[in-house]
A protein has these predicted regions:
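Hydrophobic/aromatic-enriched cytosolic interaction surfaces used to assemble or bind macromolecules
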Residues: 1-297
């Protein structure tokens, strides 16, 4: 298969991973990142197309990134999502049910595009658990226009949340764990809850205190405490044991560790995957969204 350039666009830092899907993971041959000019991309929303276009042109050129097949992974509040349980049915009927459920859940938009990702399948009951997502057509049109302006060929667009879900599937040690994946994305934190290796819930919020400060460590501990309380009220029999950090610095880990341990959580970096091959010196935790996007669903 020809190389794909996976491009993660959400906050000020842009990540790219060049590679191909494999039968059980992905092969990444190059990875790069850059910081965008301030104010051209905020929480996945393009706010200054001219500056963003110029910065991405320079990023692709400086890192010699292939431009003929770009798999975009986008995040932010423009993408709405829900977990749904659906019985066996035709694809046409399934999409109709998804549309109804997303609309009834407050995701009513003028011109929606709906999609879903299979999370698990119960062979006995023939019920599928899916991650359904909705985005307005104008958002996708905006990314298509950006691709044309920068000069790359858009191969696919996927929901940011899909990348860590796919990455977790490739790591045997996480399959029976109940943990929180904490992804640092500039001044934004995404917290994804996995119960026995299955994605269950996520939140995304801004940090009010500077990263690496003692105050940010306290703030993050408060966010985790709220997530633990939410999980407890769901009456799950599985206790949250660990918090895995991705996109974090040594300072982030240092200031967060005391608060996490006070909550009874083990602190780890998100582990590498045995089936995601990365360039020497690159950790999966540092390129999780861009690399995870290369893993086939």
């Amino acid at each position: 298969m020809a190389l794909l350039t996976s491009l993660y666009l959400c906050s000020r830092t842009v990540y790219a991973a060049v590679g191909t899907p494999t039968g059980s993971g992905a092969r990444v041959v190059a990875a790069a990142q850059t910081e965008l000019p301030e104010g051209c991309l905020i929480n996945g929303v393009i706010t200054n197309e001219a500056d963003l276009t110029a910065a991405l042109k320079e990023f692709f050129t400086a890192n010699k990134l292939p431009m003929n097949r770009v798999a975009l992974i986008a995040g932010g509040s423009q993408f709405m999502h829900r977990i749904l349980s659906l019985p066996a049915m035709s694809e046409k009927k399934r999409m109709a049910v998804l549309s109804h459920e997303l609309a009834s859940g407050g995701a009513e938009v003028k011109a929606p595009l709906d999609d879903y990702m299979l999370l698990s399948r119960d062979a006995r009951t023939r019920v599928d658990t899916v991650l359904a997502t909705r985005v307005e057509q104008r958002v996708i049109a905006g990314y298509d226009a950006l691709a044309k302006a920068v000069g790359f060929k858009l191969y696919s667009i996927d929901l940011g949340l899909a990348a860590p879900i796919k990455a977790v599937r490739t790591i045997p040690d996480l399959q029976q764990k109940t943990f929180v994946l904490l992804q640092f994305d500039d001044d934004t934190i995404s917290a994804c809850l996995f119960v026995q290796g299955q994605y269950t819930y996520s939140t995304r919020s801004r940090l009010f205190n500077p990263r690496g400060s003692a105050e940010s460590g306290t703030e993050i501990a408060q966010k985790l405490s709220g997530l633990i309380q939410f999980h407890t009220t769901s009456k799950s029999e599985h206790r949250i044991e660990t918090v895995c950090f991705a996109g974090s610095t040594a300072d982030d880990l240092a200031v967060c560790r005391p608060g996490c341990e006070a909550l009874g959580l083990q602190v780890d970096r998100f582990p590498d995957s045995p089936t995601v091959r990365l360039p020497s010196g690159t950790a999966l935790a540092d390129v999780l969204y861009a690399a995870g996007n290369l893993i086939a669903r």
